[in-house]
Amino acid sequence: VSFIAAQPKLGVADSKNEEVYRGKTPKYVFMYIGDGMSYAQVSSAEMYLGEKAMPGKVTPQQLNFTQFPVHGALMTQDSTSFIPDSASTATSLASGYKTLSGVINMDETKTKEYQPITEELKEDGYKVGIITSVPITHATPAAYYAKVPNRNSYYEIGKQLAASGFDYFGGGDFDQKTGPEGTDQHIYEIVEAAGYTIADTKEEILALNDASGKAVAIDPDDYETALDYEIDRDADELSLADYVKKGIEVLDNKDGFFMMVEGGKIDWANHANDAAASIHDTIAFDDAVKPALDFYRQHPNDTLIIVTADHECGGMTLGYSLTGYSTNFKKLQPVKMSYQEFDKIIQAYKDKKPAQPKLEDLSQDIFNAYGLDLGILTSYESTLLKNA
């Protein structure tokens, strides 16, 4: 799935036929990647919003990026499988080559490195920004500044971030801050020694601007080094859109910029088959496109916005025969939290070590979180829930 909002295109070669587009090169480029987002995720978000706005009507509410003038579709298989991972697919998006699952910007032999487009643009004088709602060293953001044979080499990826010289990193934190064994130099020290300012409070992040120099903005409310799921985010917490707005400020310059923005929590929600969390993060991803659209309206002849995805995740479907193809989006509207937040409630209950634990003890918590009344369940449904 791919959506393009402006006519100027990058003058880069296709890795297969080497044909080069020689039209106007955009000055400002926004590259959005919805991790794990395919047509089902996009459609479910639009249908959810439509049902919420007009209950009972079959009228989806279009997202910002589905209204773009150019649409396309992609085949996402990599050199390993028809079901690829984020490392190989991000490599394809960043450098133009397919590779093995788990590999970032290297070939199938893991000996030849590929140059991501960000390095080429930096050489041409562009400023570069990388934003994500998951750890900044995870596969998708890493493909825009790192080259490693194993996507799990988070510490090495972090060191390559520091060495990249790119101008703005925003969103999630670093994994393996002191290396895989916890015995290496703290990654923050390496990043700061490379000339970066680390902003890890809301006040510090909001104070960043085009005079701040190279900056890494780390979400102060992160959980597992990532932004909260959108459904769990408090109103005063920074959103993915906030990091995009700040990125535009930091990267502002006369020579142009490239910004990659990943909606990574879409993928995480899909891995857990959490439909409500997936929908809310897809909407948050779309909200993050709006600052780019606002910027585009100010610079319509110099701006390129691409919204795409790396692969589907979770096998989301919108209905099937056993439910009579009902979509039931209104049943998702009472959902107030992600599976991750509800896991904390379950763990707190377990920590109390009840003598005879019962599902009914959590009935009020379940109702508050999901709008589900255990009292209306059939015996069969109740058994399914208990076994789950």
Predicted regions and their residues:
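Sec-dependent N-terminal signal peptides of Gram-positive bacterial secreted proteins and lipoproteins
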Residues: 1-5
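Generic low-complexity segments that are intrinsically disordered, proline-rich and/or Lys/Arg-biased
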Residues: 8-9, 61
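Mobile, glycine-rich extracellular loop/lid and propeptide segments
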Residues: 10-45, 93-143, 160-161, 264, ...
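A post-motif C-terminal structural segment
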Residues: 26-28, 37-91, 138-388
